[in-house]
Amino acid sequence: MIVIFLGPPGAGKGTQGKKIAKKIDLPHIAVGDIFRTIIKTSTSEAELINNYVKQGALIPNEIVNQVIKIFLLSSQYKNGYILDGYPRNLEQARFFESFIKKAQIKIIYFDVADELLIKRVLGRYSCKNCGKIYNVHFLQPKTDYVCDVCSSNVFDYRRDDNEEVIKKRIEVYKTETYPLIDYYKNSGNFYIVNASKDEQEIENDIQKILKIN
């Protein structure tokens, strides 16, 4: 099974991707995490990508496509995966379908209001050890400064997240991705979830779509 999670930054794709992947025993591939890892390297490619991220602009298709193709054609993903953050536009979708059959794909779109997106993104942080995602407004650890999952007390706050950049990312996302939504609507494998709901309700809705018990 190949599942694509579509939605703007802050829609909850990463949180749900990890949870659903664990339930159906498939890897969760977060494109944003892949590129943040690349940015930490001391390469000219990392510097180039980092410049796009700081401006809130999308990384060019040719860079994204080649990086993702290398990942997806790895043998560890031969049985399927949950793909979070790709494709982002029609060009990427068509490139994706050049090596993945469209009939194998289920697409789930996370629909959520802009105001809530901004609040979610500005408030989110994660455990540096296990990657568990938290939010200062909606989801804090049960014990202050201690991760619920691994008990680490080291957290990672996204330095590229500020309100101006987030607003630009949302607008860029709409311009680039809305035509992709129309493209997938006619596929017969396109579903919409109300991502303004709480975390458990969203998970339940996705499980129904994927027919997970």
From Swiss-Prot:
Residue ranges, annotated region (NMP): 30-59
Reactions it catalyzes: AMP + ATP = 2 ADP
EC number: 2.7.4.3
Residues that bind ATP: G10, A11, G12, K13, G14, T15, R124, I133, Y134, K197
Pathway annotation from the record: Purine metabolism; AMP biosynthesis via salvage pathway; AMP from ADP: step 1/1
Function: Catalyzes the reversible transfer of the terminal phosphate group between ATP and AMP. Plays an important role in cellular energy homeostasis and in adenine nucleotide metabolism.
PANTHER family: NUCLEOTIDE KINASE
Family: Belongs to the adenylate kinase family.
Record's protein name: Adenylate kinase
Species this chain originates from: Rickettsia typhi (strain ATCC VR-144 / Wilmington)
